[in-house]
Amino acid sequence: MPSTRETILAALHARFSALPAAALRGEVLPERVPAAGLLLLRDGEPGEPEVTLSPLRYHYQHRAEVEAVVQGASRDATFDTLCASIGTALAADRTLGGLCDWLEAEAPVPVDLPIEGAAPLKAAVITIVLHYTSSDPLA
């Protein structure tokens, strides 16, 4: 049986997979970026939990990361559309069907990355804060 953390991250990846951009989890940046953009989900860090003792529960504010990447002449507009679609997907159900207590995204800080012999990339790391509770740090 998957852990609470893995179940939530898999649901988040599934949510991103429904978007027009290609969504990968734990992969390296491919050589080609699709026209609609690319989302790379990184598991991130669960951080130190707050602990309650009766019953024993671990309350996490897990910081997963999504690398949003676009390429091409209209990368500014494509990047904006990609970020807006991420926000819409997250706002549609902030508990991922009850798997977590709440999730929210932090604002991206985009950067333009020049690529020799190709169109530049526009990319940003978007932190997604996942609030959830588990009965065990490994469960």
List the predicted regions and their residue ranges.
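Charged, amphipathic alpha-helical segments and their flanking helix caps
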Residues: 1-33, 44-139
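Paired acidic/hydrophobic, glycine-rich loop segments that form the ligand-binding mouth/hinge
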Residues: 41
